Amino acid sequence: MDELRDYKPVQPQGGGPSVRKIIERIGALALVIGTTALKWGFVFVKFFAFFVSIAAYKLWFGSWTFALGFVLLILVHELGHAVEARRQGLHVSAPTFIPFFGAFVTIRHAGLSPWRSALISLAGPLAGGLAALACWIVGESRDSSMLIVRANLGFLLNAFNLLPIGFLDGGSVARAIGESWRMPVIRFEGGVPMQALAPDRTRALVIAALYIGLAGLLVAGMLATKGTGAL
């Protein structure tokens, strides 16, 4: 009896995972798979939309080569926005193409100063204008009317984007000019805002000068390459 009194049953050690643990692991794995699939799904859609845009512009222009070149001009324009935004430390999405409506990039930010916003907006037409200029130079050197017409459309596309209309780059620049013109200068003491002073309108004038200068160059390029041949 004494032996039975001292007997202690052996407890199972290191049993398998509980049902709850298994469910948690399955859920975590499903979340990783779902997130990855969603991410690559967006990448596929953007990649597919690029080629759909080429096909759409082929119907418009009647030439695969010209359609590809035109879409590449749009791509360079959007990359101009993206590069400047990245230079400012912002997160930028890959360009999303919409046939016959161009393309766009999404920029995540918690509010930008008018100066930073204007630089991002102007960077697209600047990059697109440089791409059109490259087409023009190569077209002249090779006597290629197709490249010169492509340059003309590139200048036109980027000049159009600088119209001071809300959803275009020019609309963003116009808003930046207005905000810079009205925005008061805040005087700080010890890191604490103490007084609102009269606006410093130098930045507004600089933005306006950059805007007018770039628009003028694009229009000049468009006029210089007008009526140079067929597709």
What are these regions (language model features)?
Residues M1-L231:
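Hydrophobic transmembrane alpha-helices and their immediate loop junctions
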